[in-house]
Amino acid sequence: GNISARIYLHNRFSVNKQGWFPWVYEQCRIVKGMRILEIGCGDGTLWVDNIGQLAMTGKRNEFSGKKKNIYIELTDISEGMISDARRNIKKATESWKERDIDVSFRFRVASCEKTGAKDESYDLVIANHVLFYCKNVNKALDEIVRVLKPGGVLVCSTYGSRHMQEISRLVSGYDKRIALEADKLFEKFGLDNGDKILKKHFSDVE
């Protein structure tokens, strides 16, 4: 679908040699014992691309206890995306049975504005190129604040007005009827206004 095609495009032509999903994962600073919520998880590529790093962090030891070391809940408004994410992550974690990896995944259909989670449930919420799709960005951020534990962290990403300018011009030159982005989503939540929007909900924005 469109999401998978866009991920391929970014992976194939990005100037960031580290790769987008490894970079996002690095910003999350995941440690043992974390409870994590990803909203708008898509097909689960964030976790599939970083499955080795996650396995290293989640490897069980004598200090881990009986509870799952890392709990990850993936949500998306699309049942199809949740189905894809479940399948992709199941395949990526097939080898974990023999390796004592203490990480659990849960998958649910839910919107950004109504996650269905309890108050103060998560140490980390991830919204990777998602917030600008929400009907009401401020309502979605209120929901994120509600489900984060005190001291919890939101890692979110967006883009700016100059995003993919070169390929947009190339495609437009080929056929002006083709538009890579029908809506200017960066106007809703982008690099130019994102920090201002976030500061209405969070005291510390980096």
PLM regions: where:
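Class I S-adenosylmethionine-dependent transferase superfamily signal
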Residues: 50, 144, 198
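Conserved catalytic/acceptor-binding region of the Class I
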Residues: 138, 151-206
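A short acidic, Gly/Pro-enriched loop at the edge of an enzyme's catalytic core
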Residues: 113-125
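Conserved class I S-adenosyl-L-methionine
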Residues: 1-34, 45-49
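A generic alpha-to-beta junction signature in SAM-dependent methyltransferases
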Residues: 28-30, 54, 141, 148
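Class I SAM-dependent methyltransferase SAM/SAH-binding core
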Residues: 35-114
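A short SAM/SAH-binding and catalytic strip from SAM-dependent methyltransferases
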Residues: 124-138
